[in-house]
Amino acid sequence: MSAKGQMLQDPFLNILRKEHVPVSIYLVNGIKLQGQIESFDQYVVLLKNTVTQMVYKHAISTVVPARPVQVPHEHPAPAAGTAEI
């Protein structure tokens, strides 16, 4: 996975984990899983509901939080001669 992918993915999953936000995880085969993210690493997400499931990231299509979350991220500095919107 690219470094940029990790820069987006890790803060998003981490805020969901820290704030115990309920999530729906859609797999590439269309199955919907629900629960809270207990932990994650480069390859898997541990999803806790009545049981804890290990879900491989390559099988995940979409992660949908039950409520809006604010993901901390750094904004790159605007290029010289451009205005920030």
Curated annotation (Swiss-Prot):
GO terms for molecular function: RNA binding. The keyword Repeat does not apply. InterPro entries: Hfq (IPR005001), LSM_dom_sf (IPR010920), Sm (IPR047575). GO terms for cellular component: cytosol. Gene3D superfamilies: 2.30.30.100. GO terms for biological process: regulation of DNA-templated transcription; regulation of RNA stability; regulation of translation, ncRNA-mediated. Residues 10-69 form the Sm domain. The keyword RNA-binding applies. It comes from the Bacteria. PROSITE patterns: SM. RNA chaperone that binds small regulatory RNA (sRNAs) and mRNAs to facilitate mRNA translational regulation in response to envelope stress, environmental stress and changes in metabolite concentrations. Also binds with high specificity to tRNAs. Belongs to the Hfq family. This is RNA-binding protein Hfq. The lineage of its organism: Bacteria, Pseudomonadati, Pseudomonadota, Betaproteobacteria, Neisseriales. The gene is hfq.
